[in-house]
Amino acid sequence: MAKILAVDDEKDILVLIQNILRRDQHQVDILDHVHGQPPDVFQGYDLILLDVMMPDIDGFELCKQIRPLVDCPILFLTAKTEEEAIVKGLITGGDDYITKPFGVRELSARVNAHLRRERRDKHQSKRVISGFLFHFDSKEVFINNNKLNLTKNEYKICEFLAQHKGRTFSREQIYEEIYGLEGNALYSTITEFIRTIRKKCKEHNADPIKTVWGVGYKWE
């Protein structure tokens, strides 16, 4: 059983989500407004479902605000299907998105897939790779004692490439590792994530991710 928070201004949607996920034995808390809520209301959950179009705050902006406080998967609920909007949401720290209207089986499958992946990632260890210190338990990366301020998906990309140092992966392979076979994001999101990772690494005079033209990316 997982503890899940669903945030949406439409109460009918919240009740539907609650009923669907309770069938999977999950505890589901609901929130139909965000304004005036203390930051800790978003903490302590295994997964958060976050509507994009809310009257008091844009869901992307809310994700950006709470991401430093929570380490669980954040899935957007959205009617937006434009590439720019999707990429924006994932770059702010979201892990995936579910398009409205959604089916009962789709919501259940996506939520449970992310929960399974999250449980697999909860292992206790650390490792130095190419001068970068990876803390796999806390999902943090350090270089020269400086912490890289990575989003959750940026960290996943770094860990995946670093643990397979020297091996080249296509954008599609990286996408599958981050989002799984049932991912609903866009391949161009991976390109944007890597661009941002490189920028953050270069602030510390490091450039571990190399482009293999026509093939993909590798960690050196």
Curated annotation (Swiss-Prot):
Protein's organism: Bacillus subtilis
Segments traversing the membrane: none
Keywords: Activator, Cytoplasm, DNA-binding, Phosphoprotein, Transcription, Transcription regulation, Two-component regulatory system
CDD domains tied to this protein: REC_OmpR, trans_reg_C
Pfam families xrefs: Response_reg (PF00072), Trans_reg_C (PF00486)
InterPro entries: CheY-like_superfamily, OmpR/PhoB-type_DNA-bd, Sig_transdc_resp-reg_C-effctor, Sig_transdc_resp-reg_receiver, WalR-like, WH-like_DNA-bd_sf
Residue ranges of DNA binding: 124-220
PTM description: Phosphorylated by SpaK.
Domain Response regulatory, chain residue ranges per copy: 3-115
Lineage: Bacteria, Bacillati, Bacillota, Bacilli, Bacillales
SMART domains noted in UniProt: REC, Trans_reg_C
Name assigned to this protein: Transcriptional regulatory protein SpaR
Gene Ontology molecular function: any one: transcription cis-regulatory region binding
GO process terms (BP): regulation of DNA-templated transcription
Protein encoded by which gene: spaR
Keyword Transcription: yes
Cellular component GO terms, alphabetical: cytosol; protein-DNA complex
Functional note: Member of the two-component regulatory system SpaK/SpaR involved in the regulation of the biosynthesis of lantibiotic subtilin. SpaR may function as a regulatory protein.
4-aspartylphosphate modified-residue sites: D51
Protein localization: Cytoplasm
